Amino acid sequence: MPDLPPAPVRTVFAPSPIGRPSLGLVRMAVYNWALARHHGGTFVLRVEDTDEARVRPEFYEPLLDVLRWLGLDWDEGPGTGGAHGPYLQTERRELHLDVARRLLAAGELYESFSTPEEVAERRTRAGQDPRLGYDNADRHTSEREKAAHRAAGRRPSLRLRLPDGETVFDDLARGEIVFKAGSAADPVLVRANGRPTFALAGPVDDALMGITHNIRGDAMLPLVPRQLAAYRALERIGVARAVPRLAHVPMVLASNAKILNSQQDPAADALGYRDAGVQARTMVNYLAALGWSHPTRGGVFTPAELVAGFDVRRVRTRPGRLDVKRLTDLDTTHLRELTAGEFTEALVPHLAPLDGDRLALLTRAAPALRRRAKSLPEAARAAAALFDDEPAATQEPDFGALQAARDALTALSPWTGETLSALLKGGLAKASVTAVRTAVTGPAHGHLLLDFLVLLGPERGLRRIDGVLARSTAQWHRDRVA
């Protein structure tokens, strides 16, 4: 990582609770967490909830839930505390306004009385497109004109005076970027109603929280000129010690190449994958690998390996595209790499509460389930079928074929994986194998027949077959009576 400051690295993830957490948003959390952990630094969570028109309280907890699920533990922030709180931006309003007063006194801000209608009229008179917006005209408003506006009951907003020249910016992911002079108008930092804007709150909070690095989406790139100007103004009044290093990474696109939006596309909802049983380590891997590759592990790595190898300069500058099949395949890969103990621990939350006998059976079954299942939910369904004392059959097998299989299994000695495999592969007719599969595992888990027979043992395995035979006999008698 180039140009690391002598002070410890402090990164920030600063989401706004305006919708369900999207994959693109959570990807920024993954990168900032990995950067902080890679350098032994601090990962800060700050909730930017100043946009009253869009913020929804019901989306606050999901932001925390998705980070907890993925193991992206924050060192400072809501629920954790820290020396730089509070960590909800609306609770920091007086801090923002105090800094704004200092900026105004230092001449970094100026009062702006222009209404949108007056700006549009000036643009039109100058032969310009009114959609160009504010024209910096209030920089030159005289004190007499300001007094007249106040006498008329008008209240000013406070704008930051941007530099007149070009802005040269060294992006950690993209390299040097030059913004032409005049590419951005002087931004409002405090509205006429006295409320601070994001253009003030973000830089002030970064400064007061000592943020050194921030990786964010490239939708924020056009804001760089005004944000750099704000950081430098804060330096000049002694609020900021340095300008944070910024990296702008490409957005995540849907499979149809449109921008992912969790409010419009369910596939963008990060928590939906948790609810579907995707492993947290898979999602961290997948999101990090959308445009980034590990220097030695390529596209498959654990969270620990991500931390060890993370370098934002390896982020590609073209957008990543969501591929759900790739995600599910990656989940299977990670499932296979779990130890039996890790697999059992991951599977338990997907099952009904287990007593000691069933937990012991699950522990014995873990290697087979891990080898055969493609996901934790699939493994959980197989485990539930293994625990069930009732016959697994949902359809009646061939009675005669099942009875023949029952006789062969009864005579089998010893009851081992080797003897059972030999019997199923060559000692039984195909119809009998099919009948046993129907009775013991049910159609959904037929590929686990041998594993089920070994795990169930002769007593429980034959009991399942006997249950199906008894049910078939009872049905035969009912049919005769009818």
What are these regions (language model features)?
Residues N32, L63, L103, G107, ...:
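Residue-level signal for inorganic ion chemistry
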Residues T11-I18, L45-D49, M209-I215, A267-A268, ...:
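Glycine- and acidic
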Residues P391-L420:
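Long, amphipathic alpha-helical coiled-coil segments characteristic
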Residues T416-L455:
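Helix-rich, typically C-terminal accessory recognition domains appended to large enzymatic cores
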Residues E111, T115-Q263, D269, H294:
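Active-site cores that bind ATP or allylic diphosphates and position pyrophosphate for catalysis
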Residues P2-Q128, L223-A230, I237, R241:
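N-terminal Rossmann-like or analogous alpha/beta NTP/dinucleotide-binding catalytic cores
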Residues E52, L234-A240, R245-P391, T441-A482:
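Catalytic adenosine-cofactor/nucleotide-binding cores of aminoacyl-tRNA synthetases and other
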